[in-house]
């Protein structure tokens, strides 16, 4: 199921935690794997258990075994997530109409503060107490380009496809950005995007 659909159903049920998921693309499996969300709530907050297939065996992990933390989880590396049970124990249940109004406002703000071009979303995790986008901006990263990939001039933590960008272009550009930020701030930006394959 798409994460957007899960978010919509949760909002309709009055789950305030789902406000943190608004506008996040992808499927529910990916959202669980990276514990998608924002300061308003992460998917891991409402997970009761997850069923997955790992090395040919079906296993069910309870909430604590999932090991949810900022942009990560504890699922086996090659696990395929097949089912999840969500339960709103700690989140506030509100009038769904009010939540939908708030969700639409959040979406509108996102559309104004994030690039419209194709991208993989936020490239780096926010370091503790700071924002990756701010650090990249301060390190003069906005507008840097490799091939068809460019650091967005709207939000520096997005690498957008300006036409014909390859995965190698994106990874090369992101590495340049990491090096700039580390030189200027002595902060190593950690990938938020999961890379699969050889980019050499």
Residue spans for each PLM region:
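Short polybasic amphipathic segments
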Residues: 48-52
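Anion-binding (especially nucleotide phosphate/pyrophosphate-binding) glycine-rich loop
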Residues: 1-28
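Short glycine- and Lys/Arg-enriched binding-loop motifs that mark or flank ligand-binding interfaces
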Residues: 19-26, 33, 117, 144
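Short beta-strand or tight-loop elements
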Residues: 16, 46, 64-66
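Gly/Ser/Thr-rich helix-start
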Residues: 24-31, 38, 122, 148, ...
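Phosphate/pyrophosphate- and phosphate-bearing ligand-binding catalytic cores of soluble enzymes
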Residues: 53-175, 179-200
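A glycine- and small-aliphatic-rich helix-loop capping segment at beta-alpha/alpha-beta transitions
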Residues: 9-15, 34-44
């Amino acid at each position: 199921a798409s994460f957007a659909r899960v978010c919509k159903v949760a909002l309709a049920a009055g789950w305030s935690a789902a406000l943190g998921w608004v506008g996040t693309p992808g499927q529910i499996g990916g959202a669980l794997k990276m514990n998608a969300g924002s300061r308003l709530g992460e998917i891991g907050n409402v997970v009761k258990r997850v069923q997955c297939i790992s090395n040919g065996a079906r296993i069910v992990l309870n909430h604590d075994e999932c090991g949810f933390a900022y942009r990560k989880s504890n699922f086996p590396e090659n696990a395929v997530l097949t089912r999840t049970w969500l339960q709103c124990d700690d989140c506030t249940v509100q009038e769904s109409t009010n939540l939908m109004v708030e969700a639409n406002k959040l979406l509108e703000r996102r559309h104004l503060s994030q690039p419209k071009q194709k991208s993989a979303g936020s490239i780096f995790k926010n370091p503790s107490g700071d924002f990756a986008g701010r650090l990249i901006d301060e390190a003069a990263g906005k507008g840097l380009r490799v091939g068809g990939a460019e650091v967005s001039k709207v939000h520096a933590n997005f690498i957008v496809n300006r036409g014909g960008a390859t995965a190698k272009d994106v990874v090369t550009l992101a590495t340049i950005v990491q090096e700039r930020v580390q030189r200027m701030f002595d902060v190593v930006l950690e990938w938020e995007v999961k890379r699969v394959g050889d980019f050499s």
